Amino acid sequence: MSQAELNGELFTLERFPPNAEEEALQAWEAADEYLLQQVNDVDGLTLIFNDGFGALACALAERNPVSINDSFISELATRHNLRMNGIDEESVRFQDSLSPLPAAPALVLIKVPKQLALLEQQLRALREVVTPETRIIAAAKARDVHNSTLALFEKILGTTTTSLAWKKARLIHCVFTAPKLADAPQTYSWKLDGTPWTIHNHANVFARSGLDIGARFFLQHLPSDLEGEIADLGCGNGVIGLQALAQNPNASVMFTDESHMAVASSRLNVERNLPDDIARCEFMVNNSLSGIEPDRFTAILCNPPFHQQHAITDHIAWQMFNDARRSLKYGGELYVVGNRHLDYFRKLKRAFGNCTTIATNNKFVILKATKVRKQR
């Protein structure tokens, strides 16, 4: 938790979920400050894209902005920081990146996302609603503004210029000129080797153009013939849960992720590949397993992320492991795949009191931890 002066006011801002070990990481950056220096002469409907922890929404709450994000955790972070600063949450309208945008905004502020495909999807959505009078400004660390970034703005929206760097941040200014643009598919699709399935990914889903090598390894070692409920935690495009659905015909599968596009991709992949099994599925956008009742699942399958936006972190994995222990039935099992260097074995041993190595190769390890009653 720290204080930031934004738009002439002092705000207390915190990363989310709160994590004492990462207090050195700020919930805002120079790119936020730089953006806010540009907006005081613009009135009207304001759209904010990819506001990681709500710094922009807090500073501009009096405008009643619309905050658009694929990340549910970013929405939770924004709500948390609004409350911490005594700002009514209802002053900001939240929507995900797949929902239609409001028409004719006066001001569009974009924090350039890590995934260029997500930026393209958002710019294409903006193309449908902006006007030549709309002020469009994007910002990022200077090192993250590439020629390819500028070319995307130019191709989709129109005339694009960039600013000088300030505190290692850079702005992108864009004027909508409606350049000719070929249509693009709504999802990326590819065949999953060894199956009749075609996998469909929305723009912000990890490994959208093919199966990542960690998931490929994990697919070879999933449990079979289970009953009860299985969770695909951090489901991404749902390929792990899809295979679990096929291998466990007497079980149901929950697909859950903090990315709206991930959960939408998972639903689409079940609908397209195993439509007769959709009744055995649940799809949930969530912060890990928050709010899920204890002692529910027979098994949880997890490939934890170790990045939050641009920061490397292990607190998301810790949260997933602890949530999994709470949500598993006694005797239930958590299966985890991860890079060997992340040392998940030690973390799982600490969280569960036990851990078994299922398989390993030169890069990845698959681990299993069982929920057991603690010895008195």
Curated annotation (Swiss-Prot):
InterPro entries in the cross-refs: DNA_methylase_N6_adenine_CS, rRNA_m2G-MeTrfase_RlmG, RsmC/RlmG, SAM-dependent_MTases_sf, Small_mtfrase_dom
Disulfide bonds: none
Listed name of the protein: Ribosomal RNA large subunit methyltransferase G
GO MF annotations, alphabetized: 23S rRNA (guanine(1835)-N(2))-methyltransferase activity; nucleic acid binding
Localization (cell): Cytoplasm
Superkingdom to which the source organism belongs: Bacteria
CDD domains, sorted: AdoMet_MTases
Top-rank EC class of the record's enzyme: transferase
Function (record text): Specifically methylates the guanine in position 1835 (m2G1835) of 23S rRNA.
EC number: 2.1.1.174
UniProt keywords, alphabetically: Cytoplasm, Methyltransferase, rRNA processing, S-adenosyl-L-methionine, Transferase
Single GO cellular component term: cytoplasm
Catalytic activities: guanosine(1835) in 23S rRNA + S-adenosyl-L-methionine = N(2)-methylguanosine(1835) in 23S rRNA + S-adenosyl-L-homocysteine + H(+)
Protein family: Belongs to the methyltransferase superfamily. RlmG family.
